[in-house]
Structure formats: C-alpha cells, structure tokens
Amino acid sequence: MGLSDGEWQLVLNVWGKVEADLGGHGQEVLIRLFKGHPETLEKFDKFKHLKAEDEMRASEDLKKHGTTVLTALGGILKKRGQHAAELAPLAQSHATKHKIPVKYLEFISEAIIQVLQSKHPGDFGADAQAAMSKALELFRNDIAAKYKELGFQG
C-alpha cells in the first residue's frame, strides 16, 4: 500500500500549489465537504449555522479551519508515510474529542481530490490523482488503526 518515491513526488509537487494558498484551498475543501455531505456539518459547532454557500465563503472561521486542516495534512504528507508521530495526536483528538468517523475522512479526501482537480488541472493529471488518492488512503487507514487502538468505532 506504500507509495513509490515517484508517487510521493507527484503528491508533494501538487501540495506545493496548495501551500501557496492554504486558506483558499482549505475553505474550498470544507465547502465541498459540507455541500456534498451536509451531515458532516453537524460535527462542527462553529459552522452548523452556515447553510448557504455564500455564508460559508464569508466565514473567516471556516477559512481558518480549512488552513488548519490542510496544514496538518501537509505535515503528514511530507513525512512520506513515516507519519506516526504526527498522526497520533490527530487521531487522539478526532477519536476522543471530535468523534469524527473514518467515513468522514473519506468524504474530505474526495473533496480534496475534487478541489485539486478544479484548481490545478495542469498539475493534477491521472498519475498525480492516483498518487494523492493512495496517500490519502494510507492516511485514513493509519487513522483507522489508531482509532481502533483507542477503542473508537468511528
């Protein structure tokens, strides 16, 4: 399930584009997540009241949280699969405090892929998409394993 060096390079190349505008990308990812899977919005007390897309776009808190999410994910991706130290506190908080099911991580992974396809079509071809999908699946599988260790059935 691991990625080759070439696959990691494809992932990190497009991630460089994401880091140039973490807020914009993060906001777009969360909007796609909430619009595509409205049930996920219920996990966010800060954002539950945001029903319309224009309200979401106007929310600085949503943009800040999107930046936080993608900053954490970027730190994990840059570890090229050697992310146990970065993953542990994230799994802990998402299992015990936020209670985020693994299914929701699948949903946000889909949103990330869609945003990258939309914003960077020239840099996110089929090979890069496949590599990113694989990297996000590795992340989800490792989070799920940590959840199990913590006794969270998410």
From Swiss-Prot:
Catalytic activity, reaction form: Fe(III)-heme b-[protein] + nitric oxide + H2O = Fe(II)-heme b-[protein] + nitrite + 2 H(+); H2O2 + AH2 = A + 2 H2O
Source taxon at top rank: Eukaryota
Record's keyword terms, sorted: Cytoplasm, Heme, Iron, Metal-binding, Muscle protein, Oxidoreductase, Oxygen transport, Phosphoprotein, Transport
Subunit structure: Monomeric.
Residues carrying Phosphoserine: 4
Keyword Metal-binding: yes
Subcellular locations according to the entry: Cytoplasm, Sarcoplasm
Gene: MB
Amino-acid positions noted as binding heme b in the UniProt annotation, renumbered to this chain: 94
GO CC, any one term: sarcoplasm
InterPro entries: Globin, Globin-like_sf, Myoglobin
Protein name: Myoglobin
Binding site for O2: 65
EC numbers on record: 1.7.-.-, 1.11.1.-
The keyword Cytoplasm is assigned to this record: yes
Domain Globin: 2-148
